């Protein structure tokens, strides 16, 4: 990687970190919107097979709802205003030249990015994504027999949320 690219990615400047947060939020918007489109396609044509997938089962629809809600709430509505715009605007508003702990600020971004990758990795778990909704309320989250994805998929989902909480 050349120096200019690594300087932008591994920076401690608050403005660049704010832009990285906004890019992460934009990526979450794109993935969440694609999941929303898949849900809407299924609602319009419930018996039509999806390309590259086949017929969508009710558990798959619940998994899409779970992942769409998680992405939009945690990685869009939390990351963009609180981390992205706060890093861009807040230091300039208070007259600071830089953040008090710039390396900690950069580490928080990379933890959020890792949490995003872990969350996307839920789709590649053999049992599938969890079907408990973005709130993760019982009974769907507490009963392993509620459906596929409630085993390893739920564990990976919880690991993603735990890493995301560490980043904030």
List where the protein language model places each region.
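...captures the hydrophobic TM-helix bundle architecture rather than a specific catalytic motif
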Residues: 1-168
């Amino acid at each position: 990687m050349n120096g200019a690219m690594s300087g932008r990615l591994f920076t401690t400047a608050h403005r660049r970190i704010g832009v990285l947060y906004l890019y992460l939020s934009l990526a979450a918007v794109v993935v969440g919107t694609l999941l929303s489109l898949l849900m809407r396609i299924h609602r319009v044509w419930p018996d039509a097979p999806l390309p590259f997938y086949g017929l969508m089962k009710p558990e798959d629809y619940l998994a899409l709802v779970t992942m769409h809600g998680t992405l939009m709430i945690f990685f869009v509505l939390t990351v963009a205003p609180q981390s992205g715009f706060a890093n861009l605007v807040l230091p300039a508003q208070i007259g600071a030249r830089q953040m008090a702990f710039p390396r900690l600020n950069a580490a928080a971004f990379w933890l959020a990015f890792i949490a995003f990758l872990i969350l996307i990795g839920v789709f590649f778990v053999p049992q599938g994504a969890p079907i408990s909704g973005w709130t993760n309320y019982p009974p769907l989250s507490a009963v392993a027999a509620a459906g596929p994805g409630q085993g390893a998929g739920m564990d990976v989902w919880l690991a993603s949320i735990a890493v995301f909480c560490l980043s904030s």
